[in-house]
Amino acid sequence: MEKGNYAFIDSQNLNLGTQKMGWKMDWRKFRIMLREKYNVTKAYMFIGHMPEFEDMYMQMHDLGFLVVLKPTQNLKPKVEKPDTKDSEPEEKKPIKGNIDADLVLWTMREIGNYDKAIIVSGDGDFYGLIEYLDEQKKLLHVMAPNWQYSSLLKPYENYIVRIDQLRRELAYFSRKKKQPVKK
């Protein structure tokens, strides 16, 4: 019996990589494509956890992704500000939810359960994982969000699928009806 393939998705790399190219991913279309084109039976989505996005995590789960949440950290130190009307609004704090170790761990932990793996990231931090999967004949593809993937991945160009080249198939379009322009 064929095991099927698994996808391991660096959601931040994918999301930022497509947005940088001026579009948003339609996650439903992406999951369907993974299943139909690449026989992906399980798609693990690694995301830095932020409580205000609980609904999004549930939506991703409902679309067929196995959501793996990683605790996040605020990178800016807390600074007490005086409470005055003239004080500037607080800057948005950068949040870091480093999922790299989790993605590698889950890929290795599940290695006996899938035929081949798809790593969805253009991040060179996954070079060692990709190298190992290739040596074990377990690598199907590396799906990079755009042409700006890490030069460390160049030896694996034969495995690279650029998601930006699939924009027409995978882009999200708002389904809201546009209001007619009044003349």
Task: List each model region and its residues.
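Terminal and domain-boundary accessory regions
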Residues: 1-183
